[in-house]
Amino acid sequence: MADIEELKFDAEVGKVLSLVVHSLYTNKDIFLRELLSNASDACDKLRHEFLSNHDLMEEGEELKVVISVDKDSKQLSICDNGIGMNRDELIANLGTIASSGTQRFLEALGGDKAKGYDLIGKFGVGFYSVFMVASEVVVDTCRAGESVGYRWRSSGDGGFTIEKLGEDVPRGTKITLTLKEDESGFLDKFRIEHVVTTYSDHLGYPVYFLDEKGEEEKLNSGIAIWTKPKAEVTAAEHLEFFRSVAHIGSEPWMVIHNKNEGAIEYTNLLYIPSVKPFDLFHPDRRCSVKLYVNRVFITEDNVQIIPQYLRFIRGVIDSSDLPLNISRETLQNNRIVEKIKTSVTKKVLSALKEKAESDHESYSKFWENFGPVLKEGLCEAMDTESREGVLSVCKFHTSACAAGELVSLADYISRMKPGQESIFYLSGDDLESTKRSPQIEKLVSSGIEVILLVDPVDDFWTSVVSEYKGVPFKSVMRVGEKDLEKCIGASDDSGDKTSEDSGESASDKESIGSFIEYLKKVLDGVVSDVRVSKKLTTSLVCLAVPDNSMDIRMERFLREQKQLNYKGNRILEINIDHPIAKSLLKEHEARGESELLNGIVHLLYDEACIIEGEEIRSTVDFASRINGVLAKIFSSK
């Protein structure tokens, strides 16, 4: 008798098994879909390895999957003649899961059973769905090119055994399930056929049912739907294929199906989901488009067939111009792959632009899901044409937009005021507070539209993208007097002028000048400059930065990430028409410098910092100054 090794599942697999068996699925048909998908992958891998080793199979041999049942023993078997597994692969594939992946799966599930359908396939745990219906699972397998087979057996109770078989085990894998008492329905041929045609009809390999007479009946069409003419692919076929490649239970938001017959021949069948994939913001930023060569699966790992900022796309790209024996390593810098990537990217951006122009409501939902990811592309190295292609499909909230409304850059430029030379934008933590920021008061009151940026990625792309269609971007934090004069002088009919613009007397100007110099003296070493604000109308103070300085939010992020160890220059702007500013000016005229007034000046700077989300220098000093002002107020009553 052959030696039998008794092994334990790793700890996280045990948790997954418990979820799968007791609570995860409401649709148990899924286990068969998972097994058929695995069998198809095994055939794909054999075909790929056969390209470099013709001893692995006979030339022209049919790769297939065969389903059979034994009603007396209550056993269901799924057999493929694909790549097979050796002992180490059995343990690696069926005994362990990468702990990080499993933990993410468990955290993602978070007690919500309904999420299981969408998440199970993403973390390599689909095989374990067999234990929903099986009391015992036996896997007999032999690796292509090897002569020794192995048997893996488990009841899903925490462990498994590995047994070495003889040398007459056929290449491939046979999975035999002993079904639970109440799962005998899966022995019915018609139910099996329904599951196959529902979930696996698109597989590139025939799936047969072996009847009692030993005859094989084909259950699936075996058609790769991306090879069919675009007009002949039905909505039902798209839905089925999308769910199989995306592991998402919803419908696709957009289908992009093209056959390119130019200098490079390829077919793409791509789907944009209507919901966010779970792994959208995974640190690896992995893309999930499968690369085929003449219907032979090559890889979906370690190759950037689409840019990372389009990683929400699912589907396949099939090319006849790549060699069948291309290795995954040489794909990295392959000229044809790069050309396909460039071409596909243009097709996707073109489709998005057309959708954005024709269906604003639908596109707004897409943008809510994937806008931040798409904007990541603006941070990547690309030529001007490519960057403008991404910018052309971007949508933004602005100071002039109603709730939920988005505008394109083309829309914004078409609404620019006479004399306005820049696309004004302001970054903030959230839409509501950014829309109320003191920074944009004068611009908004003068009818100048400001783009409001609230995604973390916005601070990055605005530091590398300087213009769109020849119109420069300019942060409101850097807007100065000249910028305002150019655009507001032609568009401001409100009569809202500052004291310096309203014909104040020479003595008034002198008093204001003296007061500003006083503020500079008190805040020397704290700010690089103090100036009368031209962009405040109702607020007292705000911060600004010099033209060539980094935006405050970006600088703060880099400091938090320990990538920056200094604080850039700040400019304090004060609204000299504000009642408090007027009172401080009078106090300075009447009494000059005082300890109380000095404290209030520091409070003005602290207020400006708080508005911008900046840390104040000393909470102790801040509290002391507040108390000093309050004491003065109440002692005078």
From Swiss-Prot:
Residues 494-508 have a biased composition (Basic and acidic residues). It is found in: Cytoplasm. The keyword Aminoacyl-tRNA synthetase does not apply. CDD domains: HATPase_Hsp90-like. It comes from the Bacteria. Disulfide bonds: none annotated. InterPro entries: HATPase_C_sf, Heat_shock_protein_90_CS, HSP90_C, Hsp90_fam, Hsp90_N, Ribosomal_Su5_D2-typ_SF. Keywords: ATP-binding, Chaperone, Cytoplasm, Nucleotide-binding, Stress response. One of its GO terms (molecular function) is unfolded protein binding. Gene3D superfamilies: 3.30.230.80, 3.40.50.11260, Heat shock protein 90, C-terminal domain (1.20.120.790), Histidine kinase-like ATPase, C-terminal domain (3.30.565.10). Residues 557-637 are annotated as: C. Belongs to the heat shock protein 90 family. Residues 1-328 are annotated as: A. Homodimer. Residues 329-556 are annotated as: B. Residues 488-508 are annotated as: Disordered. HAMAP family: HSP90. Pfam families: HATPase_c_3, HSP90. The keyword Cell inner membrane does not apply. GO terms for cellular component: cytoplasm. This is Chaperone protein HtpG. NCBIfam families: PRK05218.1 (NF003555). Molecular chaperone. Has ATPase activity.
